[in-house]
Amino acid sequence: MKKTSFVLALLPACLGLLACSVSNTPNPVRYTLTPPAPESAPAAPAVPFARIAVPAYIDTPQIVTRNSENTVVLNETRIWAEPLARAIQRAVPIQVAQNLYGKKLKDVEKVSVFIDRLDGSLDGEVLISAQIVVSRLTETEMLNDSILFSKSIPVASSEDSYAAYARALSDAVAALSQAVADNLCE
């Protein structure tokens, strides 16, 4: 009798633990940073990138949005399919090369890109700001040209606001890539 009472007393607790282990959390939706479709043109000259730096606060699996000047939100069910820093570090050189096709380049030793901000709101705009450093070697010294880049990209209205947000982030990275290319041309 005591065993039966004990088992009956534990039954609600066991059922509660079982209910907690079977979560109703939806599967995450994965997004990619999509570069523009490559043109069917011959390869452009390779640009020597020394570094493409991304702020740590956006290099998370979760998609980061900003809801005030000093507050960001990480969404647990809307995530990147790959690390965002890696996606940006892959996309920028490809896009720069596409933008340079057929243009005369300055003599460049190396290029560095330091992204300070890349975020925004789902119903507003994406902001990107970065510093582009183009290093050139002269006969006597290394010259560094530093360019500040800033742009806002509107987030299109869409049923899937995160897909529209990811597209705006992609467009912001493409705009940065265009600015890098513009500063490498004679």
Predicted regions and their residues:
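Extracytoplasmic/secreted envelope proteins and their assembly/folding machinery
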Residues: A85, Q89-P93, S170-V173, S177, ...
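Surface-exposed short loop/turn segments
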Residues: S21-P38, Q98-M142, I153-E159
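Short, solvent-exposed, polar/charged sequence segments at loop or secondary-structure edges
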Residues: S68, T77-F114
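Sec-dependent bacterial lipoprotein signal peptides
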Residues: M1-C20
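Surface-exposed helix-capping loop/turn segments at secondary-structure junctions
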Residues: Y101-L105, A181-E186
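A structural "domain/chain start" motif
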Residues: C20-A81, E186
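Short secondary-structure boundary motifs at beta->alpha junctions and helix caps
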Residues: E69-I79, E139-Q178
